[in-house]
């Protein structure tokens, strides 16, 4: 370990859950030394070397975890789809709602009509509850514009959120989310627009950190998604994929072929899909909120992910139609209750594995020397409580890049 003699701040008095290697890796009565926005020393307080700290912060017990990471959201959108919630309760399926002009397309209409400022104000309202829970990094997708102007508008709003609030925002271009109304019956023509116009322009303006697509019978075929991925490769952007949510189309295998950083949903993933993901290093992002709201019965193949050592991340999937979820902690409980994940796996899913799903694992997701000083101090005695309680105690303190977040 590099010798440290000075630091900007020294934090101690709580147990530290580092999440190194995907495990709790508890440091009882730990200490963290920070210079700038980085951790320069971490370990048991009793082993702290002589360090001169410009400032000291003493916690009175509790737990410190890495800052939470919500690695899959659709937080920027216009309109309201609470009426669809009532329809689904009355037995109307997601596919039927979409076929009747609802679903994603109704949000597309509202998003296209909204100004950039209106979208920003609505997204700020949705983002603040996640910040209050200790989220320090979030991914936000486009996908409700479905034309060049509106997709860029959404991505600009997402970038702006990261400028206005103390949170890291990663943006994803999801132009291949649904078929826009002006291209009904012409999916290949729309994919031409995505590949030849939207993705190149988004890359030129540096508005996206990745490209995503929705591979499903009510969205785009594997062949169409492959074209999107090739365009992303040409633009120098990594890829992700909504795959195997409602049916088995081998989208996860396609994602693995392109070394996608993540494949998401995965309720219908097969063993061969999981094997391909394991070989490619693709993270499985599980979305229990959508599973719950859609009353799905096919669980993602958790045991296969364990068997083949595919990292499992969790996310809110915050969106207006299938997962109106503004609580990442609720997803921890749902993952344990619905998917039979362990509390330790669930916490890894919103820290180290979520970081990997965004390609930021070198700087975030665990508490260790050299990484960003992003953490949450909880008034709890055991990390399993984060998944155990439904609602309840919010963080006592959130530290973002070495400073207490207001």
UniProtKB/Swiss-Prot annotation:
InterPro entries: Amidohydro-rel, HutI, Metal-dep_hydrolase_composite, Metal_Hydrolase. Signal peptide: none annotated. Keywords: Cytoplasm, Histidine metabolism, Hydrolase, Iron, Metal-binding, Zinc. Binds 1 zinc or iron ion per subunit. GO terms for biological process: L-histidine catabolic process to glutamate and formamide; L-histidine catabolic process to glutamate and formate. Fe(3+) binds at residues 72, 74, 242, 317. The keyword Cytoplasm applies. It holds the Pfam family Amidohydro_1. Gene3D superfamilies: Metal-dependent hydrolases, Urease, subunit C, domain 1. Catalyzes the hydrolytic cleavage of the carbon-nitrogen bond in imidazolone-5-propanoate to yield N-formimidoyl-L-glutamate. It is the third step in the universal histidine degradation pathway. Belongs to the metallo-dependent hydrolases superfamily. HutI family. This is Imidazolonepropionase. It comes from Yersinia pseudotuberculosis serotype O:1b (strain IP 31758). The lineage of its organism: Bacteria, Pseudomonadati, Pseudomonadota, Gammaproteobacteria, Enterobacterales.
């Amino acid at each position: 370990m590099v010798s440290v003699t000075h630091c900007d701040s020294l934090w101690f008095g709580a147990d530290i859950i580092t999440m190194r290697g995907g495990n709790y890796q508890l440091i009882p009565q730990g200490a963290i030394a920070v210079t700038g926005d980085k951790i320069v020393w971490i370990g048991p307080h009793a082993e702290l070397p002589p360090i001169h700290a410009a400032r000291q912060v003493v916690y009175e017990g509790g737990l410190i975890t890495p800052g939470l990471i919500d690695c899959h959201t659709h937080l920027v959108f216009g309109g309201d789809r609470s009426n669809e919630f009532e329809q689904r309760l009355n037995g109307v399926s997601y596919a039927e709602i979409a076929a009747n002009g609802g679903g994603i397309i109704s949000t597309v209409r509202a998003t296209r009509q909204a100004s950039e400022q209106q979208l920003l104000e609505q997204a700020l309202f949705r983002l603040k509850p996640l910040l209050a829970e200790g989220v320090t990094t979030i991914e936000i997708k486009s996908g409700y514009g479905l034309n060049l102007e509106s997709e860029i508008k959404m991505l600009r709003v997402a970038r702006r959120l990261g400028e206005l609030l103390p949170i890291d925002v990663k943006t994803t271009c999801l132009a291949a989310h649904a078929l826009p109304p002006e291209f009904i019956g012409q999916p290949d023509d729309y994919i031409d627009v995505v590949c030849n116009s939207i993705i190149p322009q988004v890359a030129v303006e540096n508005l996206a950190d990745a490209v995503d697509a929705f591979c499903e019978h009510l969205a785009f075929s594997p062949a169409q998604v492959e074209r999107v991925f090739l365009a992303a490769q040409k633009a120098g952007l990594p890829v992700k994929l909504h795959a195997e949510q409602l049916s088995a189309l081998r989208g996860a295998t396609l994602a693995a072929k392109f070394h996608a950083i993540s494949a998401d949903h995965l309720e219908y993933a097969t063993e061969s899909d999981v094997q391909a993901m394991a070989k490619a290093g693709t993270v499985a992002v599980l979305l229990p909120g959508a599973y719950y709201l859609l009353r799905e019965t096919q669980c993602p193949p958790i045991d296969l992910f364990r068997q083949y050592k595919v990292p499992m991340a969790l996310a809110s999937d915050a969106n207006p139609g299938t997962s109106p979820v503004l609580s990442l902690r609720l997803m921890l409980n749902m993952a344990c209750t619905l998917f039979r994940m362990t509390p330790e796996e669930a916490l890894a899913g919103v820290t180290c594995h979520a970081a990997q799903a965004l390609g930021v694992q070198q700087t975030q997701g665990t508490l260790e020397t050299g990484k960003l000083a992003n953490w949450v101090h909880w008034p709890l005695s055991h990390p399993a409580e984060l998944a155990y309680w439904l609602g309840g105690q919010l963080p006592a303190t959130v530290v973002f890049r070495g400073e207490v977040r207001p």
